[in-house]
Amino acid sequence: MLDSLQERGWWKGQRLELNLDDELCQIANCLGQPIGARRRRSIVEVLKPMSADLAYANSLSAQYQLSSFPFHVDTAHWPTPCKYIVMGCKSPGSCDRKTLLIDWKSLQLDDSDMNVLKNAVFLVKDGARSFYSSIISDNNDFIRYDIGCMYATGPDSKIALKILSSAFRKSVKIEIKWEEDDILVLDNWRILHGRSRSSDPMSMNEPRELHRVLVK
């Protein structure tokens, strides 16, 4: 697993002997310090496609509901985004929703593009803890990118969004098709992920269920 994370930024395997949540926590503990996505919540978070009225306010689920999710890194609204994401499939559902990955290192970005991404300023909204930040920085190893919580503050940041939108369109996407008990680990400082559209977008009864543990 560690070799795969180092080489390509992600690893996929299967649950072995433990129950799914225990195995996710065991992997997370091997990688660093597990941490809950929201204060006073369980370390293991259940992720299901849902309508806005059932989702956390301002989350991607609230904004995009049952449709596809844009590419992003998790916890972009934290001062330092989590290092790893450990996900497991409790149920793949019947609508063939895939997780899509893009390796930041594979993006076709020239020096001019990188300079814009380093200098364009975004407002990162997190209630009273909101702050300003760029997408990348010479001082940090991580990417900060999530249009669900990052807002352009001027022409430069709008150009930065266009640069990445173009790079994403041209990039190679890795499709993760889920089966029960699959486990996926992502280097959240390198791999952006999104969610594909449902094969039945009108369905409100999709039982797909992923469990997630974040690692500092």
Residue spans for each PLM region:
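Short secondary-structure junctions
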Residues: 32-38
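Glycine-rich, aromatic-bearing surface loops/beta-hairpins
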Residues: 25, 39-42
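N-terminal functional module of multi-domain proteins
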Residues: 9, 26-32
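Active-site environment of non-heme Fe oxygenases that use a 2-His-1-carboxylate facial triad
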Residues: 1-10, 16-18, 42-216
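A structured, charge-rich N-terminal accessory region that forms the first stable segment of a protein
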Residues: 14-16, 24, 34
